[in-house]
Amino acid sequence: MDYFPIFCQLQNKACLLVGGGEVAERKARLLLDAGAAVTVNACEFTEQFHDWAEQGLLSLVSGEFAPELLAEKWLVIAATDQVAVNALVYQSANQQRVFCNVVDDPKRTSFIMPSIIDRSPIMIAISSGGKAPVLARLLREKLEAMLPQHLGQLAQLAGNLRQRVKQHFAAMTDRRRFWEKLLTHDRLAQSLANEDQVQVEQHVEQLFNAPLSDRGEVVLVGAGPGDAGLLTLKGLQQIQQADVVVYDRLVSDEVMNLVRRDAERIFVGKESGRHTVPQDQINQILLQQAQQGKRVVRLKGGDPFIFGRGGEELETLADYNIPFSVVPGITAASGCSAYSGIPLTHRDHAQSVRLITGHAKKDSQLDWANLAAEKQTLVFYMGLSQAGEIQQQLIRHGMPAATPVALVENGTSRHQRVVSGELSQLALLSQQVSSPSLIIVGSVVSLREKLNWFSSAEHGKTGMKEQVERVG
């Protein structure tokens, strides 16, 4: 370990910054954020430094650096573009035993400034020891994306509750279970993010008053259409906190690989027209797992509220007062069309888009005359087995037989395949693809040849490319 990681309390501590340019500005912001009493020494200063000085946030000392400026200082940062000045600052600081950082000069540095993730009071520092600062920055960006913005508020809430928790729970195991429930409570987290103090207090009281074993919850998460990169950040956070993940066939292996390793996985195998596990039984699985005090993620392909029967599952939970929340996902229509180079709307082609299920209840009747209207795009989910009926009804109700159509198989994945042609060929085209597939009908499909980007790019280590076929 080349450097000992340490967090310094600089509130009202005297610190010196040598340099008055843009680099020094960035360092000054960090010192000011930490509450330090900052003195800045330089021959010239940027406008920002003058503004800070006028506001009384720091002091300016104009002129050449002199060792006397280090008197009674806790630390110094040298951020000039003059090597000799920076060397003098470092030498003087060493002689007076003052911690010194020389920007971009690891050999003349007694402390380094890491990349920082600030979720005060939670602070995360990342350093490469000056070896690879760009790598440290990239790591910080990845962690920034993973950590929710309300994390600091959650930590502050936990701090406020510590004494009460000690008094309320005598056993350490009960305290630990309480903290785990509180710190992973999705609805509480959302209330903190919304700054809804009333809801926050209600959730906290519910956690204190309900038996620990009864404090399960269900989070309905949309996994997106296939590409794991399309899973939302919040969705990723949820599947990595889950005790149990209930998932179906439309969730890709790549997404499942992101699930918390020790989480229980329950496969319910849903697909169009055939359910390995009936919907009523899925509802009961969610209910029973939550009643055991577990954090349950119901992971569904696409978006759970678009032909995903997510609403039906939540109704059951609501009937039994099980806490639940929803994390939307990118629906198949959006993902598959984008990865196929087919804009769902376009001023010259379509002013609206219709999302239609090809697997509705038996007594449901579609308004085919309305669907056959011009200037719109139709997207049929789970419509492969009904392709012949869709073709026949749309043509019968006035849609031109030459209307462009596309079928997208395994959309957004490395196995994506697109078959395109005309409406009059839809039944034939459907025989060339397998489920899961999406049917897109409308003149926007004609833009695919010009706008398709996915087929020309290699994906992953396999270098596989989208397969494209056209009939006609």
Swiss-Prot record:
Residues the record lists as binding NAD(+): E22, V23, C43, E44
Alphabetical keyword list: Cobalamin biosynthesis, Lyase, Methyltransferase, Multifunctional enzyme, NAD, Oxidoreductase, Phosphoprotein, Porphyrin biosynthesis, S-adenosyl-L-methionine, Transferase
Residues the record marks as active site: D248, K270
GO terms, biological process: cobalamin biosynthetic process; methylation; siroheme biosynthetic process
Residue segments, region Uroporphyrinogen-III C-methyltransferase: 216-472
CDD domains, sorted: SUMT
Superkingdom of this protein's organism: Bacteria
InterPro entries on file: 4pyrrol_Mease (IPR000878), 4pyrrol_Methylase_sf (IPR035996), 4pyrrole_Mease_sub1 (IPR014777), 4pyrrole_Mease_sub2 (IPR014776), CobA/CysG_C (IPR006366), NAD(P)-bd_dom_sf (IPR036291), Siro_Cobalamin_biosynth (IPR050161), Sirohaem_synt_dimer_dom_sf (IPR037115)
Coiled coil: none
Binding site for S-adenosyl-L-methionine: P225, G301, G302, D303, I306, T331, A332, M382, G411
EC number: 2.1.1.107, 1.3.1.76, 4.99.1.4
Record bears the keyword Cell inner membrane: no
Family, as annotated: In the N-terminal section; belongs to the precorrin-2 dehydrogenase / sirohydrochlorin ferrochelatase family.
NCBIfam families linked to this entry: cobA_cysG_Cterm, cysG_Nterm, PRK06136.1, PRK10637.1
Protein name: Siroheme synthase 2
Originating organism: Yersinia enterocolitica serotype O:8 / biotype 1B (strain NCTC 13174 / 8081)
Originating gene: cysG2
